[in-house]
Amino acid sequence: MNQFLPLLVTDIHRTIRDAVVLTLQPEDPSAFDFKQGQYLTFKQDFGGTELRRNYSICAGRDDGVLQVGIKRVDGGAFSTFANEVLKVGDTLHAMPPQGSFSSALEPDRAKNYLGFAGGSGITPVLSILKTVLAREPKSTFTLVYANRAVNTIMFREELEDLKNRHMGRLSIIHMLESGQDIDLFTGRVDQNKCAELFKTWIDVSDMDMAFICGPEPMMLAIADALKSQGLEPDQIKFELFSESQQGRL
């Protein structure tokens, strides 16, 4: 359905200095029922030019809200507008949820999931892990989350809360470019770094499904590393984006 529908902005909060989480209220909630990992396409007029941008839903399916996370991109018209101009009470327009960055949920099975996120690529992965933890009570989720520094980690407090609430089911490995006590958790996530992680911290042979969202070179390197450990292509899900269309993230 290629139709834009109104969404009332009911809350805006910052998860880091240059990223906001928007809570949105549709006139017709049924039109915005979503699967974990999906995204919304927004349109907005800027000086007579219509821009369309995709932003991933960061809420879980059982959160009872529709939320997207938007990180400000240098020179990005929509992301700057969302971070600096948009206010509670404004109305945005978006198409109903789209995307297939998910897998079927099986409440009776005990599955092991692995997620990799780079920067704002956490938004769809957060939706997936929250939904899995809520709807597959026997399943586990391991998240490897790469950022430049501690103060650039989106949803850091929420992730810690989730880890405490689901003790033993959610593991989080923060990878930072610097400032980590453990060398393994310092530096970019590339194929060599994955090989080290898989040797000492993550048993890929136990994993049923992997989700990867972040810069394309990182995702391709991770996928190659996972395949070298025996994961099949249909066990690896991507959410790709390019520099010219960063809105999804």
Where does each model-flagged region fall?
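Ferredoxin-reductase
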Residues: 2-91, 95, 108-111, 147-149, ...
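FNR/FR-type flavoprotein reductase catalytic core
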Residues: 80-249
